Amino acid sequence: MKPVPLVLLITSVLLTTHIPLSTCRPRDLSLVNSQLDDVLSNGAGDDAMSYLVGEKLLQYLQRNLGAQKASGVLHLPHFPAAQLRSPHEDSSLEELTEFSKRNDDPPISIDLTFHLLRNMIEMARNENQREQAGLNRKYLDEVGK
């Protein structure tokens, strides 16, 4: 194994093993839910696709949260968010919300690109079938005369 990938692998393993588990969990679920509601309500008026994605995302999160509560995995105490956050975290939260706002033209993902490509191929196939059907009708009309 080359030394650079080995060093990167060791570094990533060491860094990921020293992350405290509390940093990976939300501190206040009501804060997360209200932020999720804000994000979904802001993007819901854009178009039908964002509405459907928002609905599916909300259903998934509610189902996932319900499953976690039922299995007893989720044991987070309910603390007020103001006591847990420092002023530095408040400013970083504001920066994050500014950064996460939707742009006017969102980037096209690979899934969307492949979906559009499949639709274009299907439309071309349908057009070819229509042209072939027109030619077949024309040949049958000439042979029938």
Swiss-Prot record:
- Identify this protein by name: UI
Please provide, in alphabetical order, the Gene Ontology terms of the cellular component aspect for this entry: extracellular region
- Please give the function described in this protein's UniProt entry: Urotensin is found in the teleost caudal neurosecretory system. It has a suggested role in osmoregulation and as a corticotropin-releasing factor. The non-hormonal portion of this precursor may be a urotensin binding protein, urophysin.
Membrane-crossing ranges are none
Q: Where Valine amide occurs along the chain?
A: 143
Spell out the InterPro entries in the cross-references: Corticotropin-releasing_fac_CS, CRF, Urocortin_CRF
What are the GO MF terms of this UniProt record? hormone activity
The primary site where this protein sits is secreted
The cross-references to SMART domains, in alphabetical order and at most eight, read: CRF
Q: What is the lineage of its organism?
A: Eukaryota, Metazoa, Chordata, Craniata, Vertebrata
* Protein family (similarity comment): Belongs to the sauvagine/corticotropin-releasing factor/urotensin I family.
Q: Is this entry keyworded Signal?
A: yes
Keyword set, alphabetical order = Amidation, Cleavage on pair of basic residues, Hormone, Secreted, Signal
**Compartments, as annotated in UniProt:** Secreted
Q: Give the signal peptide range.
A: 1-22
